[in-house]
């Protein structure tokens, strides 16, 4: 078990928390990052492209002129790919790009990302992050002036609606519930901010 400082919104230590080395203390694995990042990017592809090849373009069934004797190059169809209005050679077709590595790989990538943030000292664990009302200005002041962050991913339970509504409107900050944590979101931000409750939730989910 590794010990982490739990701080308040002014970065003052208020307590300590013990978290599993299996989740927050593993050796970061770059290959797992690659596999899961590839999955997230590939699965965003819609795959709806569709172009007609020679066999799908209407018309062109008749030979435009006889094979020999006209002085012109021989042609078999006015819908060949080199004709205007012809079909596309090797036309792309709609396809499903869905890709999903094994569950062990996906969980391992998240553990590696959390451990990387812990090793780089860019993991902040708060005792709580409550706002009086859903105000983006208030959330921005807390994150930039009190926590001294310019770019961060905040993880807290769904029940904290004021926080979620406040942070989701900020350009360089994102907020997710623990069950929505994903590799791309962690690596895209320079800092990871967890509430102590969210840290325990992640520990339980990934152990």
From Swiss-Prot:
Q: Which residues form the signal peptide?
A: none
Q: What GO annotations for molecular function exist for this entry?
A: rRNA binding; structural constituent of ribosome
Note down the stretches annotated as region Disordered.
Answer: 52-76
Keywords from UniProt, A to Z, are: Ribonucleoprotein, Ribosomal protein, RNA-binding, rRNA-binding
Protein's UniProt keywords contain Repeat:
no
Q: Name one GO biological process term.
A: translation
Q: Which Pfam families match?
A: Ribosomal_L4
A cellular component term (GO) from this record?
ribosome
- Domain of life, per the record? Bacteria
Query: What InterPro entries does this protein's entry cite?
Result: Ribosomal_uL4, Ribosomal_uL4-like, Ribosomal_uL4_dom_sf
Subunit description: Part of the 50S ribosomal subunit.
Q: Which family does it belong to?
A: Belongs to the universal ribosomal protein uL4 family.
The record describes the protein's role as: One of the primary rRNA binding proteins, this protein initially binds near the 5'-end of the 23S rRNA. It is important during the early stages of 50S assembly. It makes multiple contacts with different domains of the 23S rRNA in the assembled 50S subunit and ribosome.
Xref: PANTHER family: 50S RIBOSOMAL PROTEIN L4 (PTHR10746), LARGE RIBOSOMAL SUBUNIT PROTEIN UL4M (PTHR10746:SF6)
Q: What's the protein called, per UniProt? A: Large ribosomal subunit protein uL4
Which species?
A: Myxococcus xanthus (strain DK1622)
Organism lineage: Bacteria, Pseudomonadati, Myxococcota, Myxococcia, Myxococcales
């Amino acid at each position: 078990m590794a010990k982490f400082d739990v701080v308040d919104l002014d970065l003052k230590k208020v307590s300590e928390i013990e978290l599993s080395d299996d989740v927050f203390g593993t050796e970061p694995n770059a290959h797992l990052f690659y596999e899961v990042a590839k999955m997230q990017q590939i699965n965003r592809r819609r795959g709806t492209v569709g172009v007609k090849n020679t066999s799908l373009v209407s018309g062109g069934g008749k030979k435009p002129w006889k094979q020999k004797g006209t002085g012109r190059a021989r042609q078999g169809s006015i819908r060949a790919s080199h004709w205007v209005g012809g079909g596309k050679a090797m036309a792309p077709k709609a396809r499903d790009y869905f890709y999903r590595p094994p569950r062990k790989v996906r969980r391992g990538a998240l553990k590696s990302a959390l451990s990387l943030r812990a090793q780089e000292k860019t993991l902040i664990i708060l005792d709580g992050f409550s706002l009086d009302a859903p105000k983006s200005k208030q959330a921005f002041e807390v994150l930039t002036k009190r926590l001294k962050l310019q770019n961060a991913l905040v993880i807290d339970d769904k029940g904290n609606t004021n926080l979620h509504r406040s942070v989701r409107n900020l350009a360089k900050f994102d907020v997710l519930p623990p069950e929505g944590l994903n590799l791309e979101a962690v690596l895209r931000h320079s800092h990871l901010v967890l509430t102590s409750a969210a840290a325990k939730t992640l520990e339980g989910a990934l152990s």
